[in-house]
Amino acid sequence: MAEAHVTKVGIVGIGFIGSDHLHRLTKTVANVDVTAVCDIVPGKAQKALDQQGLTATTYEDYHDLVNDPNVEVVVCTANNEAHYEIVMAALKAGKFTFCEKPLALDAKQCMDIIDSEKKLGRRMLQVGFMRHYAPEYVQMKKMIDDGVIGKPLMMDQRHYNQTQPEEYDSSRSIIETAIHEIDIDHWLVNDDYANIRVFSPKQTRHVQNAKIQDPQIVMIETKSGINIINEVFVRCQYGYDIKCDVIGEEGVLELPTVPQVATRLNAQYSTAILTDWKARFESAYDIEFRDFINHVSQNESPVGPSAWDGYIAAVTADAALKSLAEDGAKQDLDFPSTPAFYTESEKVSE
């Protein structure tokens, strides 16, 4: 491998996750220099830098950051609506790009990104599906591939958030929340989806808008017949709760919970439940960025989740939204074969 050098990174979008990645890239990941930060809100980029005791060039227009010669790699953590245009601009500039999920708002936009990346002749983009790097999911993947529980038959999951603002509507529950399970399930069982249905149980009283459907039940069937159930509840109140059980012919795999110190006090035995994703997947985010930077710092293509993974997730999410709008009607799914551009680039990078 070529000798690594300090990679100059620019971050577009400095909200909650953007600020978290700013800290990660400057304090946790080696061989990185964050040289520029951009946010459309005046003064927000500088405020984030000041809060973390950092210095960098600040911009309000992402075009200025993308075209800055002192930026080699673009990290997109802007609002979902802006992902497409930022990624397209970064690829046009010929720069390695990391884009938080979702890659874009729909499958068509994802395919445009794929076409742009292909024109560059090699992989330049990684999508932030960080669960691929979570040690517990990696272990589950290996055990499934090794046939430890026989062939997978069913999956039972939940994705609960403590709360979300009123503007976090039914579509965002799919595009921003359920998208994680849509992606990771496809990766875990390595089986394309055949159809999807989304149902709405009784609405929680913690939603004031009658048009918002929370919770939701997402049901997916794969080509080989695996049945997947995912409960999505973004206002569960009690905490951030992730569950993944894979039921096979010979046994069951259970995703472990994050270890917490147990307390014996006042005639009670209890353990805490996390309240958000930040602590739950902190190590996955760290490993994800170390891997991404390790490759691009040596001018190598990234090997993590690709634009094609983003496309598969988007096609499925589009169908999920249609099912939700049609009161749970089954939506058939049919994916083209993975382009050789992606399978071959992954083999080369390995």
UniProtKB/Swiss-Prot annotation:
PANTHER family named among the record's database cross-references: INOSITOL 2-DEHYDROGENASE, PTHR43593
Single Gene Ontology MF annotation: nucleotide binding
Involved pathway(s): Polyol metabolism; myo-inositol degradation into acetyl-CoA; acetyl-CoA from myo-inositol: step 1/7
Protein's recorded name: Inositol 2-dehydrogenase/D-chiro-inositol 3-dehydrogenase
Subunit description: Homotetramer.
Gene3D superfamilies in the cross-refs: Dihydrodipicolinate Reductase, domain 2, NAD(P)-binding Rossmann-like Domain
Naturally occurring in which organism (per UniProt): Lactiplantibacillus plantarum (strain ATCC BAA-793 / NCIMB 8826 / WCFS1)
Keyword set includes GTP-binding: no
